[in-house]
Amino acid sequence: CIRDRAANGINRPESGKRTAPSALNKQDVDVYVVLPEGSYLYDAKNHQLTLVSEGDHRDAVAGGQTFVKTAPVSLVLVSDVSRFGDAQKTQNQLVGAMDAGIVSQNISLFCANAKLATVPRGSMDATQLKKVLKLKDAQIPMLNHPVGYFK
């Protein structure tokens, strides 16, 4: 969970603000943790993982790139663009993608410091992930980070 807190956790409890800024402080990006035994939502407020779906769903994250299936953990960054208003509005989707990019940067920096291997990726089976993670229409998987060890 330390990695999740660094990615998008609350670092100013008095205001509820996070380690990654977001447009209008809407905090639209949620971090999902995909492990071999299940997929979890990172609850920033309580600094804990909540089980969303049992089973190994790393195939959905892999999106055809087999190396991702062997990563011990993958982080999926989901923007709930409804927090900006109209979820169908292109500008809101672009802002959600930007916010996910900021969280992605935090993950990359944390992993570099912790000597973990990661790569930000846009490739994934978003349709399958939406089912597995039980996402609403306005929740869009934007990026993912397989995390592992250097060979």
Label each PLM-derived region with a short phrase:
Residues K134-K151:
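A glycine-rich helix N-cap at a beta->alpha junction
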